[in-house]
Regions:
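Mature catalytic domains of secreted/periplasmic carbohydrate-active enzymes
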Residues: 1-109
Length: 109
């Protein structure tokens, strides 16, 4: 039942100047059609790019900005960080920090 135009219009009618949405939280799940991972909204039964729809609605309606909170942390990615004492399901060693940085930069383009 997600309706980007309705969200944007409601925000504008309430006098808001911007909308902020979490594009990717620490769990690594992406609310857009990511080319870098299948851990995204397009791999769910919903199969719609939420961020794209919100961006289009903001442009069409006008007068309201769209902002993103994008977590650099990504617990889902195997190269994010080596395991800390409370994380039993992550490797103790062997993560590739540079590979994770490259992955993150590609997502931000």
């Amino acid at each position: 039942q997600f309706n980007a135009r309705a969200w944007v219009q409601m925000a504008k009618d309430a006098g808001m100047k911007y909308i902020t949405i979490t594009s990717k939280h620490h769990d690594g799940f992406c609310l857009w059609d990511s080319k870098e991972t299948d851990f995204d909204v397009m791999s769910t039964p919903f199969k719609r790019d939420i961020l794209k729809e919100l961006a289009e609605a903001c442009r069409e309606i006008g007068g309201i900005r769209l902002c993103f909170y994008h977590s650099i942390m990504d617990w889902h990615h195997p190269d994010y960080n080596e395991r800390r004492t409370w994380e039993k399901d992550r490797p103790v060693a062997g993560t590739e920090r540079n590979r994770y940085i490259s992955y993150t930069k590609k997502q931000l383009k």
